[in-house]
């Protein structure tokens, strides 16, 4: 098997991390590279373990997304996962993962990931963990009650778009990862691109994310913005919001990507080889970001 190559690419999460802190960006995409190998240098291994950490809110979102994916995958295969089974299995999974994280097992099996709160010994009351579980259960129950799910159930499987087959597309020579969570063709012959949300609304972030979905539809699926329905699904509230899009707004997204990619490449020692040197990536001066950074113990251990 050929060695993995650290290829430069763009995604919304990469863009956000770059804006938050250049040093954090370096640790995540360059310093941690290869840290999964058994014989990785100690520093790369530590950075890789820290990179895999999630806050408890991020963990909850991931659990919900994967639960929804289970349901949709089963439907595609002609099966129906009962709501009660999914809720029970998800809660059991959360207990297993919480226990493994609390025991810091992620330091020996880093790909499994751990919780930021456990690594940095952040006090969390038992009732707060229970509220997190209740939040996940609420999101899953709301998913089952969405009229949107009824529409998806009625849609012939050949009109589902298999997103996992094409996760990225080329944008001016850079791979861009911006695929939606789910997509299907509606009865009105419009392409519905779905984004599952579990947290508080963030209009700016959502606009960029949905714009990337519209760009994905144009570049990968060859569908014009006018035929696309961008659906933001708030599972916490059980609400669906449709966002209109047009060619003008798509141009704004292209402009954002071009500027972001140029800025990231400007920090590289050798852009063609995607070679980065840590000293070229400054630390943020906003200590509020530092306190909740996965790499705090390496970068600002005094906090």
Question: Could you tell me what each predicted segment is?
Answer:
Residues 3-9, 28-51, 119, 189-194, ...:
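Short amphipathic alpha-helical segments and their helix-coil junctions
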Residues 8, 12-17, 50-58, 62, ...:
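Short, charged/polar micro-motifs that form catalytic or ligand-binding hotspots
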Residues 15-39, 170-183, 258-263:
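An acidic intrinsically disordered interaction segment
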Residues 15-31, 40-76, 87, 91, ...:
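Nuclease catalytic cores
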Residues 31, 196-200, 234, 247:
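A short beta-strand motif that forms part of the nucleic acid-binding face
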Residues 36-40, 157-218, 272:
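Non-catalytic protein-protein interaction segments used by genome-maintenance enzymes to assemble
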Residues 67-161:
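A non-catalytic, helix-rich entry segment at domain boundaries
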Residues 145, 172, 205, 219-303:
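Metal-dependent nuclease catalytic regions and adjoining charged, substrate-binding loops involved
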């Amino acid at each position: 098997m050929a060695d993995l190559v650290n290829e430069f690419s763009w995604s919304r999460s990469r863009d956000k991390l770059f804006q938050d802190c250049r040093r954090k960006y370096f640790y995540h995409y360059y310093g941690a590279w290869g840290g999964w190998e058994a014989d990785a240098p100690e520093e790369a291994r530590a950075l890789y373990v820290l990179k895999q950490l999630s806050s408890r809110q991020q963990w909850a979102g991931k659990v919900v997304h994967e639960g929804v994916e289970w349901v949709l995958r089963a439907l595609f295969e002609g099966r129906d996962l009962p709501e009660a089974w999914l809720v029970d299995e998800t809660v059991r999974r959360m207990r297993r993962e919480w226990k493994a994280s609390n025991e810091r097992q992620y330091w020996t099996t880093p790909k499994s990931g751990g919780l930021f709160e456990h690594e940095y010994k952040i006090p969390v009351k038992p009732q707060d963990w229970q509220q997190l579980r209740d939040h996940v259960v609420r999101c899953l129950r709301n998913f089952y009650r969405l009229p949107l799910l009824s529409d998806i159930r009625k849609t012939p499987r050949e009109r589902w778009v298999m997103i996992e087959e094409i996760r990225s597309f080329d944008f001016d020579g850079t791979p861009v990862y911006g695929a939606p969570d789910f997509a299907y063709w509606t009865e009105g012959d419009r392409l519905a691109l779905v984004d599952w949300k579990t947290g508080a609304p963030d209009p700016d972030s959502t606009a960029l994310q949905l714009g990337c979905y519209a760009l994905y539809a144009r570049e990968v699926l060859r569908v014009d913005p006018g035929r696309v329905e961008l659906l933001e699904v708030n599972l916490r509230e059980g609400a669906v919001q449709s966002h209109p899009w047009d060619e003008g707004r798509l141009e704004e997204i292209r402009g954002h990507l071009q500027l972001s990619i140029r800025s990231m490449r400007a920090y590289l020692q050798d852009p063609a080889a995607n070679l980065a040197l840590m000293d070229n990536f400054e630390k943020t001066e906003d200590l509020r970001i530092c306190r909740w950074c996965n790499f705090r113990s390496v970068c600002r251990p005094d906090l």
